[in-house]
Amino acid sequence: MTALKKAGLLRTYYRDRLRGYRLGAKAKLVLLDGWPERFTFCLTGDAETNRLKSEANRRFRLHRLAETYITIGNAGVLLYPDEKPKVFAQTGFGGEAVTYPVFYSSREVKELGADATQIRSSRFAGVLLAPTGIFVTYNSGGALMKWRYKSELRVKTLLWNILCQQRLAQQYRVEQVHGLVLGDSMDLAYQILTSTGGAKHDYFMLDGSYDHFYFLTNDHQGEVILALLCDPVKTAELDRILSQGLSAGNPGSAMEQDAAEPDGTPVLFGYFCDLPRIVRFNTALELMERPGTLICFDFQADVLRHYCGDRVHLQTIDFTKFEGRLFP
């Protein structure tokens, strides 16, 4: 940072007792001269990201977006416009399939033009397209984010129409659109699991907008699990390892489960922290007054144990050993 500031590429900005860094004109020219196909999109014309955003809430929003890009980029997902198909462009999309994990920011999605006017009030950071599905991505930071059910449902509906029924209809089905929320720590996962939306019902809660809503942390552990979420082959290998000594779950059962203990105790693979699925599993166990087993990573265990209580037995996966085996 010091070297960039001395070179005149970064400048410090203070307002409302918050310090930030901004690209100087020299830095923008360097990026545009060196990689025009990558940075013209966001550094020229009347681009939204080229405007100064000095209000505290807008600066925090930009920080969360930048944090999202770092987490997703470190998971091996492609981010830059020149690396991916122009799926959301009004013109220029050639109908090519998405064969690798790619992320489109909310601003890129809004390139659709008139079709995107209905989602302007959404809190989503962008959309992750992976072989395993479409993930509408949010970053809640360290606390519950503001949430408007109808606004977020419009995002889901737009993706159904544009991706599942039009541009990528051969690749994705409507049931493959899921939610993904990033947070600073697993403590936020507990807040989400127990949230009722606040007094005005305007904070994030599991309101049924997505049947599957994954929670990942903005750290190395979250990055590795995100890479796993995008990789169906490695996910299948982990499931195979976890299934050793277990029998197949009952697909006809009303209870959410992935396997069963030899004595019939239902088992859920909860390592992706699919929060609605964990809620459904725990609720079913309570209604049936029976025990269950939840398998998760070691760093997720305390929060999930706190939420599920004594009825659920937790088995943990050593994250370090897992990473060494599947992501050496």
What is each PLM-predicted segment?
Residues 49-146:
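Exposed, interaction-prone assembly regions rather than primary DNA-binding/catalytic cores
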Residues 11-45:
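Accessory beta->alpha helical hairpin/"wing" motif in late/C-terminal subdomains of nucleic-acid enzymes
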Residues 137-145, 169-328:
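Long, compositionally biased intrinsically disordered regions
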Residues 31-35, 42, 146-150, 280-281:
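A short, polar/proline- and glycine-enriched secondary-structure boundary/capping micro-motif
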Residues 11-12, 76-83, 239-248:
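Short secondary-structure junctions
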Residues 2-9:
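Basic amphipathic alpha-helical segments that dock to polyanions
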Residues 62-68, 148-167, 195-199, 275-282:
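Well-ordered, non-membrane alpha-helical segments in soluble/globular domains
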